[in-house]
UniProtKB/Swiss-Prot annotation:
Role according to the record: Catalyzes the attachment of glutamate to tRNA(Glu) in a two-step reaction: glutamate is first activated by ATP to form Glu-AMP and then transferred to the acceptor end of tRNA(Glu).
Main location: cytoplasm
'HIGH' region (motif): residue ranges: 11-21
Protein name per UniProt: Glutamate--tRNA ligase 1
Superkingdom as given in the UniProt entry: Bacteria
Organism: Methylobacterium radiotolerans (strain ATCC 27329 / DSM 1819 / JCM 2831 / NBRC 15690 / NCIMB 10815 / 0-1)
């Protein structure tokens, strides 16, 4: 076996790239990059009824969005069926596999007998050493592996440790169905061998498959790749992650406003640790990642923790990068807000200018976009209930009073507008908040916003005065 590490991510395109699959891809990618090896991508599309092009596209898009690039061309398993069949025939010719003519009724009876006797259902090997001349007429056989019946099958797993199975408990699995289609077990082994895979990293729900596949590798005289079966992801309640926990596809996390770097960082900490470090740059992840530091216990997905981490990434991101990230989600979230991509240049400039104040409190790009509502809202602004309450007769009176002071400013900035509003409040004998709150309501339509005077600076003199005029027209 070559010393170069080759991992593979092998999703089935029967649905979108879910969060567990994304973490599996990340671990494969990190291990490959850490060791200077390669990560290959194989689409296991042998289930023709459930595999869809939409799911394939979603998987590829999800990986690309997460920044997980693969090496070489994508391998499609279904296209390799002839190769899989040829290997089954090789095993048959070598006496390491055999034709089985057991009927569906016989197999059903085996299962029923096993249940009645309180043992796991398994094929009883009735055609293992039987003369093919005894084959019943009109029955198309399957090809079964002639698996060892004594001793143990052992997997030295990088995460689970030494795992053993008594061979007497593992039956002769089907390699080729009666219609000539290869089974998943055979296809995976042949593809992993032909692709030069040296390290398999996948969920621990595949652990039993490891025994089956190891037997096929051995029957073919091929090296068995090293294996690492990582724990599944559970919800906060300890149950296996499902849609009721919000186990969404990666594309949904994108549209919810999570940054790919933040999601990568969160996913790497689900089951893997490096001391007590929580925040990792991509370079730090690659340098530190080690399969020996992956735990065996199921990791719990915590949306609040993800949101907090995403907020940290937002606060430390460059302002222009955040605006660019917002533009990428506008095709899905923009129409309901009256926005489309690309943003108009003047709005884009205003967003970048406003970003230092906007990003301090936002935990997602959606929150960021909604807190910037005042920049793209159409005049006259729609007021929420709290803002409307602030613009009572008294509030509108304050607006009418402060407006001439603002109009007279020779220059317009956060500092100059703050000075003017403070001066007006003092001359009017009222507190700053009694002027600032109606101003905020008139300029943003809400009672919470980024710092008021930053808002005024970004809106500019003309737009600020126009919005004040909408709420407190001059007589």
């Amino acid at each position: 076996m070559s010393s170069a590490v080759v991992t593979r991510f092998a999703p089935s395109p029967t649905g979108y790239l879910h969060i567990g699959g994304a973490r599996t891809a990340l671990f494969n990618w990190l291990y490959a990059r850490h060791t200077g090896g390669k990560m290959l991508l194989r689409i296991e599309d042998t289930d023709r009824e459930r595999s869809t092009k939409g799911a394939i596209d979603a998987i590829l898009d999800g990986l690309s969005w997460l920044g997980l690039d693969w090496d070489g061309d994508v391998v499609f398993q279904f296209a390799r069926a002839e190769r899989h069949r040829a290997v089954a025939e090789e095993l048959l010719a070598a006496g390491r596999a055999y034709h089985c003519y057991a009927t569906a009724e016989e197999l059903a009876q085996m299962r029923e007998t096993a249940r009645a006797e309180g043992r796991a259902p398994r094929y009883d090997g009735r055609w293992r050493d039987r003369d093919p001349s005894e084959a019943p007429a009109g029955v198309k056989p399957v090809i079964r592996l002639r698996a060892p019946i004594e001793g143990e099958t052992v997997v030295e797993d990088a995460v689970q440790g030494r795992v053993t199975w008594a061979n007497k408990d593992l039956d002769d699995l089907v390699l080729l169905r009666s219609d000539g289609t290869p089974t998943y077990m055979l296809a995976v082994v042949v593809d992993d061998h032909d692709m030069g895979v040296t390290q398999i990293i996948r969920g621990d729900d595949h652990l039993t498959n490891a025994a089956r596949q190891s037997q096929i590798f051995s029957a073919l005289g091929w090296d068995v790749p090293r294996m690492a079966h990582i724990p599944l992801i559970h919800g906060a309640d300890g149950a296996k992650l499902s849609k009721r926990h919000g186990a969404l596809g990666v594309e949904a996390y994108r549209d919810l406003g999570y940054l790919p770097a933040a999601l990568r960082n969160y996913l790497v900490r689900l089951g893997w640790s490096h001391g007590d470090q929580e925040v990792f740059s991509t370079e730090e992840m690659v340098a530190a990642f080690d399969l020996g530091a992956v735990g065996r216990s199921a990791a719990r997905f915590d949306f609040a923790k993800l949101a907090n981490l995403n907020g940290l990434y937002i606060r430390t991101s460059a302002d222009a990068d955040l605006v660019a990230a917002i533009e990428t989600i506008l095709p899905n979230v923009g129409p309901e807000r009256g926005l489309s991509a690309p943003l108009q240049p003047d709005l884009k400039d205003k967003l970048i200018q406003a970003m230092p104040g906007l990003k301090e409190r936002a935990k997602t790009l959606i929150e960021l976009l909604d807190s910037a509502y005042y920049l793209y809202a159409q005049r006259p602004l729609a007021l929420d209930d709290k803002a409307r309450a602030l613009l009572s007769d008294e509030g509108r009176g304050r607006l009418a009073g402060v407006r001439p002071v603002l109009e007279a400013l020779p220059d317009w900035s956060a500092a100059s507008t703050e000075g003017a509003v403070r001066q007006y409040a003092e001359s009017a004998g009222c507190k700053l908040g009694q002027v600032a709150q109606p101003l905020r309501a008139a300029l943003t339509g809400r009672t919470t916003s980024p710092p008021l005077f930053d808002v005024m600076a970004v809106l500019g003199r003309e737009e600020t005065l126009a919005r004040l005029g909408d709420q407190a027209p001059q007589g």
